[in-house]
Amino acid sequence: MIFQGGLGEFKFEMVKALVMTGFGLNCDLETSYALEVAGAEVERVHLNSLISSEKSLTPYRIFVIGGGFSWGDDHGAGVIMAMRLKHRLQDQIAAFVDTGGIVIGICNGFQVLVNLGLLPGFQWGEMKREVALIANDCGGFRDQWVTLSVNPASHCVLSRDIRSIELPIRHGEGKFFAEPGVIEKLIGRQQVFLRYAKPDGSPALAEFPFNPNGSVEDIAGICDLTGRVAGLMPHPEAFNHFTNHPDWTFFKEKYKREGKPIPEEGEGIKFFRNAVGYFE
Protein backbone atom coordinates (compact mmCIF):
# COMPACT_ATOMS: atom_id res chain seq x y z
CA MET A 1 0.00 0.00 0.00
CA ILE A 2 1.54 3.35 -1.10
CA PHE A 3 0.80 6.70 0.59
CA GLN A 4 1.54 10.24 -0.57
CA GLY A 5 2.93 12.66 2.01
CA GLY A 6 4.83 15.90 2.36
CA LEU A 7 8.07 13.98 2.26
CA GLY A 8 7.07 12.06 -0.85
CA GLU A 9 5.81 8.53 -1.33
CA PHE A 10 6.23 5.87 1.31
CA LYS A 11 5.13 2.28 1.41
CA PHE A 12 3.15 0.84 4.31
CA GLU A 13 3.37 -2.93 4.56
CA MET A 14 0.31 -4.54 6.11
CA VAL A 15 0.83 -7.54 8.36
CA LYS A 16 0.16 -10.64 6.26
CA ALA A 17 -1.81 -13.54 7.69
CA LEU A 18 -2.41 -17.02 6.27
CA VAL A 19 -5.58 -18.85 7.28
CA MET A 20 -5.33 -22.52 6.37
CA THR A 21 -8.25 -24.29 4.70
CA GLY A 22 -9.12 -27.79 3.56
CA PHE A 23 -10.12 -31.28 4.69
CA GLY A 24 -12.88 -30.20 7.06
CA LEU A 25 -11.57 -26.92 8.48
CA ASN A 26 -14.66 -24.72 8.26
CA CYS A 27 -14.16 -21.46 10.18
CA ASP A 28 -11.81 -19.84 7.67
CA LEU A 29 -14.20 -17.14 6.43
CA GLU A 30 -15.01 -15.66 9.83
CA THR A 31 -11.38 -16.03 10.93
CA SER A 32 -10.23 -14.15 7.83
CA TYR A 33 -12.84 -11.47 8.46
CA ALA A 34 -11.69 -11.02 12.07
CA LEU A 35 -8.07 -10.63 10.97
CA GLU A 36 -9.04 -8.13 8.28
CA VAL A 37 -10.98 -6.05 10.82
CA ALA A 38 -7.86 -6.20 13.00
CA GLY A 39 -5.82 -4.70 10.15
CA ALA A 40 -4.16 -7.70 8.51
CA GLU A 41 -3.88 -8.60 4.84
CA VAL A 42 -5.34 -12.10 4.79
CA GLU A 43 -5.11 -15.02 2.39
CA ARG A 44 -6.97 -18.30 2.73
CA VAL A 45 -4.67 -21.10 1.59
CA HIS A 46 -5.47 -24.80 1.16
CA LEU A 47 -3.19 -27.25 2.96
CA ASN A 48 -2.32 -28.90 -0.35
CA SER A 49 -0.96 -25.60 -1.68
CA LEU A 50 1.51 -25.53 1.21
CA ILE A 51 2.46 -29.19 0.82
CA SER A 52 3.03 -28.82 -2.93
CA SER A 53 5.13 -25.66 -2.36
CA GLU A 54 2.72 -23.64 -4.48
CA LYS A 55 2.50 -21.48 -1.36
CA SER A 56 4.95 -20.95 1.50
CA LEU A 57 4.65 -19.57 5.02
CA THR A 58 7.64 -17.29 4.39
CA PRO A 59 5.78 -14.09 3.31
CA TYR A 60 3.39 -14.23 6.27
CA ARG A 61 3.68 -13.15 9.89
CA ILE A 62 0.56 -14.89 11.24
CA PHE A 63 -0.46 -18.50 10.54
CA VAL A 64 -3.89 -19.64 11.71
CA ILE A 65 -5.34 -23.14 11.86
CA GLY A 66 -8.99 -22.55 12.66
CA GLY A 67 -11.95 -24.56 13.81
CA GLY A 68 -13.77 -27.38 12.10
CA PHE A 69 -13.64 -31.14 11.92
CA SER A 70 -10.53 -31.96 9.91
CA TRP A 71 -10.79 -35.46 8.45
CA GLY A 72 -14.05 -35.83 10.36
CA ASP A 73 -12.11 -36.15 13.65
CA ASP A 74 -11.21 -39.68 12.52
CA HIS A 75 -8.61 -41.28 14.84
CA GLY A 76 -9.23 -38.36 17.24
CA ALA A 77 -9.73 -34.64 16.71
CA GLY A 78 -6.80 -33.05 14.89
CA VAL A 79 -4.72 -36.23 14.72
CA ILE A 80 -4.58 -36.77 10.94
CA MET A 81 -4.09 -33.07 10.19
CA ALA A 82 -1.22 -33.00 12.69
CA MET A 83 0.40 -36.03 11.05
CA ARG A 84 0.10 -34.43 7.63
CA LEU A 85 1.76 -31.24 8.91
CA LYS A 86 4.43 -33.15 10.83
CA HIS A 87 5.56 -35.22 7.85
CA ARG A 88 5.30 -32.52 5.18
CA LEU A 89 5.64 -29.09 6.82
CA GLN A 90 7.34 -29.53 10.19
CA ASP A 91 10.59 -27.80 9.18
CA GLN A 92 8.75 -24.92 7.52
CA ILE A 93 6.54 -24.36 10.58
CA ALA A 94 9.55 -24.51 12.91
CA ALA A 95 11.40 -21.96 10.78
CA PHE A 96 8.30 -19.74 10.73
CA VAL A 97 8.18 -19.64 14.53
CA ASP A 98 11.96 -19.34 14.83
CA THR A 99 11.92 -16.18 12.70
CA GLY A 100 9.26 -14.51 14.85
CA GLY A 101 5.95 -15.62 13.34
CA ILE A 102 2.74 -16.11 15.29
CA VAL A 103 0.86 -19.43 15.11
CA ILE A 104 -2.75 -19.57 16.33
CA GLY A 105 -4.78 -22.75 16.74
CA ILE A 106 -8.50 -22.33 17.43
CA CYS A 107 -10.60 -25.34 18.51
CA ASN A 108 -9.69 -27.99 15.92
CA GLY A 109 -6.56 -25.94 15.27
CA PHE A 110 -5.65 -26.20 18.96
CA GLN A 111 -6.15 -29.96 18.76
CA VAL A 112 -3.83 -30.01 15.75
CA LEU A 113 -1.11 -28.02 17.54
CA VAL A 114 -1.05 -30.30 20.60
CA ASN A 115 -1.01 -33.44 18.44
CA LEU A 116 1.77 -31.92 16.36
CA GLY A 117 3.71 -31.20 19.56
CA LEU A 118 4.14 -27.51 18.77
CA LEU A 119 2.32 -26.91 22.06
CA PRO A 120 3.24 -26.78 24.86
CA GLY A 121 6.75 -26.47 23.40
CA PHE A 122 8.75 -26.93 26.60
CA GLN A 123 11.85 -27.77 24.58
CA TRP A 124 12.08 -25.83 21.35
CA GLY A 125 12.56 -27.98 18.27
CA GLU A 126 11.36 -31.24 19.85
CA MET A 127 7.69 -31.05 18.82
CA LYS A 128 6.85 -33.56 21.53
CA ARG A 129 3.21 -34.42 22.32
CA GLU A 130 2.83 -33.80 26.06
CA VAL A 131 -0.80 -32.68 26.45
CA ALA A 132 -4.09 -33.81 24.94
CA LEU A 133 -7.59 -32.57 24.19
CA ILE A 134 -9.91 -35.48 24.80
CA ALA A 135 -13.64 -36.27 24.90
CA ASN A 136 -15.77 -33.94 27.01
CA ASP A 137 -16.71 -35.28 30.44
CA CYS A 138 -20.37 -34.62 29.64
CA GLY A 139 -20.16 -37.34 27.00
CA GLY A 140 -21.23 -35.27 24.01
CA PHE A 141 -20.82 -32.19 21.88
CA ARG A 142 -21.19 -28.81 23.63
CA ASP A 143 -22.30 -25.61 21.90
CA GLN A 144 -22.55 -22.74 24.40
CA TRP A 145 -21.06 -19.43 25.50
CA VAL A 146 -18.55 -19.42 28.33
CA THR A 147 -16.93 -16.86 30.60
CA LEU A 148 -13.14 -16.89 30.48
CA SER A 149 -10.52 -15.37 32.75
CA VAL A 150 -7.15 -14.30 31.35
CA ASN A 151 -3.87 -14.78 33.19
CA PRO A 152 -2.31 -11.29 33.46
CA ALA A 153 1.14 -12.82 34.00
CA SER A 154 1.04 -14.79 30.75
CA HIS A 155 3.37 -13.78 27.94
CA CYS A 156 0.84 -14.86 25.27
CA VAL A 157 0.68 -12.15 22.61
CA LEU A 158 -3.04 -12.77 21.99
CA SER A 159 -4.24 -11.92 25.49
CA ARG A 160 -2.47 -8.61 26.04
CA ASP A 161 -4.61 -6.15 28.07
CA ILE A 162 -7.55 -8.59 28.29
CA ARG A 163 -8.66 -9.71 31.74
CA SER A 164 -11.95 -11.52 31.07
CA ILE A 165 -14.07 -12.27 28.02
CA GLU A 166 -17.11 -14.23 26.91
CA LEU A 167 -16.76 -16.48 23.86
CA PRO A 168 -18.60 -19.43 22.31
CA ILE A 169 -17.31 -22.99 22.41
CA ARG A 170 -18.46 -25.83 20.16
CA HIS A 171 -16.64 -29.11 20.45
CA GLY A 172 -16.90 -32.74 21.47
CA GLU A 173 -13.22 -33.24 22.34
CA GLY A 174 -12.19 -30.17 24.30
CA LYS A 175 -11.14 -31.51 27.69
CA PHE A 176 -7.57 -30.38 28.34
CA PHE A 177 -5.60 -33.19 29.94
CA ALA A 178 -1.98 -33.74 30.94
CA GLU A 179 0.01 -35.48 33.65
CA PRO A 180 0.34 -33.54 36.94
CA GLY A 181 4.00 -32.72 36.30
CA VAL A 182 3.17 -31.21 32.91
CA ILE A 183 0.30 -29.17 34.38
CA GLU A 184 2.66 -27.90 37.08
CA LYS A 185 5.15 -26.83 34.41
CA LEU A 186 2.50 -25.04 32.36
CA ILE A 187 1.22 -23.11 35.34
CA GLY A 188 4.68 -22.37 36.76
CA ARG A 189 5.92 -21.02 33.42
CA GLN A 190 2.76 -18.91 32.92
CA GLN A 191 1.87 -20.79 29.73
CA VAL A 192 -1.79 -21.11 30.70
CA PHE A 193 -3.30 -17.87 29.42
CA LEU A 194 -7.01 -18.72 29.38
CA ARG A 195 -9.27 -20.54 31.87
CA TYR A 196 -12.97 -21.26 32.14
CA ALA A 197 -14.67 -19.17 34.82
CA LYS A 198 -18.06 -18.50 36.38
CA PRO A 199 -20.05 -15.47 35.20
CA ASP A 200 -18.73 -13.40 38.14
CA GLY A 201 -15.15 -14.13 37.04
CA SER A 202 -14.35 -16.58 39.83
CA PRO A 203 -12.70 -19.92 38.91
CA ALA A 204 -15.02 -22.55 37.44
CA LEU A 205 -13.32 -25.20 39.60
CA ALA A 206 -14.34 -27.90 37.09
CA GLU A 207 -18.04 -27.16 37.71
CA PHE A 208 -20.29 -27.88 34.74
CA PRO A 209 -21.43 -26.01 32.67
CA PHE A 210 -18.99 -23.20 33.53
CA ASN A 211 -16.19 -25.59 32.67
CA PRO A 212 -18.02 -27.22 29.74
CA ASN A 213 -15.72 -30.17 29.15
CA GLY A 214 -13.97 -31.08 32.41
CA SER A 215 -10.62 -29.53 31.49
CA VAL A 216 -7.97 -30.02 34.16
CA GLU A 217 -7.39 -26.76 36.08
CA ASP A 218 -10.14 -25.18 33.93
CA ILE A 219 -7.58 -24.74 31.13
CA ALA A 220 -9.06 -23.27 27.95
CA GLY A 221 -5.91 -22.01 26.23
CA ILE A 222 -2.12 -22.31 26.44
CA CYS A 223 0.89 -20.80 24.69
CA ASP A 224 4.50 -21.83 24.19
CA LEU A 225 7.46 -20.22 25.95
CA THR A 226 7.75 -17.48 23.31
CA GLY A 227 4.09 -16.49 23.69
CA ARG A 228 3.80 -16.51 19.90
CA VAL A 229 2.35 -20.01 19.51
CA ALA A 230 -1.07 -20.19 21.13
CA GLY A 231 -4.04 -22.52 21.12
CA LEU A 232 -7.51 -22.16 22.59
CA MET A 233 -10.76 -24.11 22.45
CA PRO A 234 -13.15 -21.09 22.49
CA HIS A 235 -13.84 -19.29 19.20
CA PRO A 236 -12.83 -15.59 19.23
CA GLU A 237 -13.59 -15.32 15.50
CA ALA A 238 -17.24 -16.18 16.28
CA PHE A 239 -17.60 -13.00 18.35
CA ASN A 240 -16.56 -10.53 15.67
CA HIS A 241 -19.67 -8.32 15.93
CA PHE A 242 -21.63 -7.01 18.89
CA THR A 243 -24.77 -8.81 17.69
CA ASN A 244 -23.04 -12.22 17.82
CA HIS A 245 -23.52 -12.25 21.59
CA PRO A 246 -26.70 -14.12 22.61
CA ASP A 247 -27.69 -11.27 24.96
CA TRP A 248 -26.88 -8.41 22.61
CA THR A 249 -30.39 -6.93 22.76
CA PHE A 250 -30.15 -6.73 26.56
CA PHE A 251 -26.76 -5.03 26.41
CA LYS A 252 -27.93 -2.67 23.67
CA GLU A 253 -30.74 -1.40 25.89
CA LYS A 254 -28.44 -1.30 28.92
CA TYR A 255 -25.86 0.83 27.11
CA LYS A 256 -28.57 3.16 25.80
CA ARG A 257 -29.94 3.73 29.30
CA GLU A 258 -26.46 4.35 30.65
CA GLY A 259 -25.66 6.76 27.83
CA LYS A 260 -22.85 4.58 26.54
CA PRO A 261 -22.06 4.04 22.86
CA ILE A 262 -23.17 0.73 21.38
CA PRO A 263 -20.10 -1.11 20.08
CA GLU A 264 -19.96 -2.61 16.62
CA GLU A 265 -17.08 -5.01 17.13
CA GLY A 266 -17.37 -8.15 19.18
CA GLU A 267 -14.80 -8.65 21.90
CA GLY A 268 -13.25 -11.62 20.11
CA ILE A 269 -11.59 -9.17 17.72
CA LYS A 270 -9.26 -8.16 20.58
CA PHE A 271 -7.27 -11.38 20.20
CA PHE A 272 -6.67 -10.68 16.52
CA ARG A 273 -5.84 -7.01 17.10
CA ASN A 274 -3.22 -8.13 19.58
CA ALA A 275 -1.72 -10.55 17.05
CA VAL A 276 -1.57 -7.93 14.30
CA GLY A 277 -0.45 -5.20 16.71
CA TYR A 278 2.51 -7.31 17.80
CA PHE A 279 4.20 -6.50 14.48
CA GLU A 280 3.27 -2.81 14.30
Give the residues covered by each predicted segment.
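N-terminal beta1-alpha1 cap of cysteine-dependent amidohydrolase-like domains
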Residues: 1-106, 110-128, 134-142, 216, ...
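Amide-donor transfer/coupling interface in amidating biosynthetic enzymes
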Residues: 49, 53-55, 93-95, 128-280
